[in-house]
Amino acid sequence: MSFYVDITFCLDISSNMERIIDNIKNHISELPEFIQDTYSLEGKTITNMRAKIMTFGNFVEGTPISHSRWFYIKGFDSIHNNKCNKLLVSSISSLSDYESIEFKHFVNNIHLEKNATNTSNGLEALSQAIKSDWISNGEKRRHVIVIYTLNEASKLEESNRTINIYPNDIPVTLKELTDTWIYPPSQTEGLTKASKMLIVCAPQNYPWPEIFEAWDQVTYNPSVKDSFDLFYEDVFNCIFSDI
């Protein structure tokens, strides 16, 4: 049975993340390998795994949502469009090793923005993550969003959509975003009720408890500052609960 895993990490880069950002970056860097290694202990294999990073802050303070490319941690069904240096790849045991190194390098080079508010545009980032170009191959699939923040999210109903860095096609209410998750839009290829998973590392501030209560397929960890080791287990159990 082929098993395909996509993970989109959404990382708040507001300045108040400073005290935990190094732990989070280590967590993100190590999580794909942890998933593979732990799954292999069950005598099973992941056919294809991709990961990408989205960073967000506060639009009012000039921080846009930024997207990385997909990094092919394992398996290369779509690797033909990868523009990596072939000479460098030839010195590494495999292209997946190269991609893992590039992924970790990208994560390590994430820097925080200076800002003065304790709110961020986490809901807009979540909306864009839902619309990721998810892989549609494989007999079994997991499409996972992991969001890290210490902030309350700005309300969609109060967003200033005239700011030039504000993305297009963002829901205008939390209810509309909820519907987008529960009933994925047609352009979101591969995302289904069976494949989707949302993992929230955020405090008990708006809207994270509300999302945990109203959305399906959600794991919520309000103790992101303290529980990284336990969270690894939460992620694994979430991804492989019915595989």
Predicted stretch roles:
Residues 2, 44-47, 136-141, 190-193:
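Extracellular/periplasmic catalytic domains that process cell-envelope and extracellular macromolecules
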Residues 2-11, 101-109:
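Surface-exposed beta-strand-to-loop junctions
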Residues 3-148, 153:
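Von Willebrand factor
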Residues 17-27, 115-125, 170-173, 228:
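Phosphate/oxyanion-binding active-site loops and adjacent basic polyanion-contact surfaces
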Residues 151-212:
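VWA/integrin I-like adhesion module and closely mimicked acidic/polar interface patches used
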Residues 215-243:
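C-terminal "exit" segments of structured domains
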